């Protein structure tokens, strides 16, 4: 891991280098994705079947072979162990409860001239959620993407999940059952994104696509944005831990590992006010890494993008955190709620030594789909509001038409838009 000290003259340069990440789009990936999207848009189900058989090594004869029914999802739920059933239901219940509190409501008021103004909230009609399949299967992603849509009132939630070599993950399908997914298609990659965006003979066009995926899925989401909405194009996972030395070093070490084990380009950063404590955490990491099944990935991640930063105090730690704008921020300090008030930019803030980031990933309640790559400066976690729309309401009274008409007429003439002005004037006495 890199070692930085805010008192060093080259600290700012070192911090910028630490956060630098090459996000340039791969031209070859973009070309392949463009061809796939165009083909699926043109040939629909036939193209989808061909690409699925090619990339996932399946043997689908027709689109019916790529459809899972509610009975299939229920059967998957029944096959998993009881403790896993309970865990899925507990997580779903907590996520639902949290996202119910995010739900936007319609409102209106009447001004002094009798004109009604307001905002009408409506859910999206149909959404698609992409879930990685095969060995890298994440049932938690199903719950985090589907449950907010369900809470928002989306009538049709369509899930696509690849099944390499026909391998279905029962826990993922059980999560779909628990989270209220309407339909499931066993397709993945750019071809699945294209099918959701443009529609095929069998897969209906959706209004928005959410969910994580590989580079081809990310490129496809970028390409279809505008035809449909998307949640975000997420970068590598990140964690930043601010520690005052009161949390056991082993706990912090494992929290850093929890993000580093995602992949070799994930980023784990520890900010501390004591060099002795940073050394203690480093020693814990050296000891605990021996027990990690994904040791190679963790070591590569920490070596590539990990860091320990020594600061003079917690105020400085918060300033640096706001600059980094991490996906996950752990405030492993005393009085965490007070320090949280100093945080302006973070996807999720985990307060106190008992609030491990992994609890938020799975079952605390808030969404684990979070902005990465410093985008927390201007964006937010996935939520119920992402599956709702706002429409403005205006009902002008006869009296209001006189006052507003005069104002609108003057402004319209100022813009040389005569029809606009006349439309307002016709309603004036």
Swiss-Prot record:
One of its GO terms (molecular function) is NAD binding. It catalyses: L-histidinol + 2 NAD(+) + H2O = L-histidine + 2 NADH + 3 H(+). The active site is at 327 (proton acceptor), 328 (proton acceptor). It comes from the Bacteria. PROSITE patterns: HISOL_DEHYDROGENASE. GO terms for biological process: L-histidine biosynthetic process. One of its GO terms (cellular component) is cytosol. Disulfide bonds: none annotated. Keywords: Amino-acid biosynthesis, Histidine biosynthesis, Metal-binding, NAD, Oxidoreductase, Zinc. Pfam families: Histidinol_dh. Substrate binds at residues 237, 259, 262, 328, 361, 415, 420. HAMAP family: HisD (MF_01024). Catalyzes the sequential NAD-dependent oxidations of L-histidinol to L-histidinaldehyde and then to L-histidine. This is Histidinol dehydrogenase. It comes from Neisseria gonorrhoeae (strain ATCC 700825 / FA 1090).
